[in-house]
A protein has these predicted regions:
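Hydrophobic scaffolds flanking metal-cofactor catalytic centers in soluble metalloenzymes
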Residues: 1-186
Length: 186
């Protein structure tokens, strides 16, 4: 990992921690889970017994990790496609910064629509919040249909950019054990 690129890009982004890319982070073992619990983070159980750290991460402060030196192994080793492309010189830092800004803008649009509906627990990953809002009983009025269509379109725009620029494919595939999209609780 190139420290100057991570300082430049990752600290402006945070999408891998805020529930936009992933529903949760799979931990490596009980020791890692206990260490995070001692730091005050809630760890959920999973089939492997290692534990899951739900997203959005409670340690995220703005766009930065509040436990950076002690973050889980999965977080230490993950590099999004955009960071990899910047490291290879396939995309300039300026272009990468613009993609991050565009992703944040699209995500904020989804959050604004959810807020207008009064829907979605902010402690849930973005896609789950949308699914809850869309599954809610808002009736069959013209206004409800308009809101649903707007939310679906906004979330589709987010997912398209995320898969293309951050998870490494124009198609929705499993790019991480807990990736948003086809792999996330659908």
């Amino acid at each position: 990992m190139n420290p100057s690129l991570t300082d430049t890009l990752c600290t402006r982004c945070g999408l891998c921690c805020d529930g936009s890319l992933f529903a949760d982070v799979e931990l490596v073992g009980q020791a890692e889970a206990r260490r995070l619990e001692i730091m005050g983070l809630e760890v959920d159980d999973n089939e492997s017994g290692a534990g899951l750290l739900s997203q959005p991460c409670a340690a995220l402060q703005g766009r930065r990790c509040g436990i950076y030196a002690h973050r889980p192994k999965c977080c230490r080793t993950f590099e999004c496609q955009l960071l990899q492309d910047a490291q290879l010189g396939a995309v300039t830092v300026e272009a990468a910064t613009e993609l991050i800004a565009e992703a944040l803008k699209r995500i904020q649009r989804v959050r604004d629509l959810l807020a207008q509906w009064g829907a979605g627990d902010v402690r849930l990953p973005l896609k789950e919040r949308c699914a809850e809002a869309l599954a809610g009983d808002g009736g069959d009025t013209r206004e409800t249909k308009r809101k649903r269509a707007a939310l679906k379109a906004a979330m589709s725009a987010v997912e398209s950019l995320i898969w293309r620029s951050f998870l490494g494919s124009g198609e929705q595939k499993v790019a991480h054990p807990r990736a948003v999209g086809a792999a996330q609780r659908e």
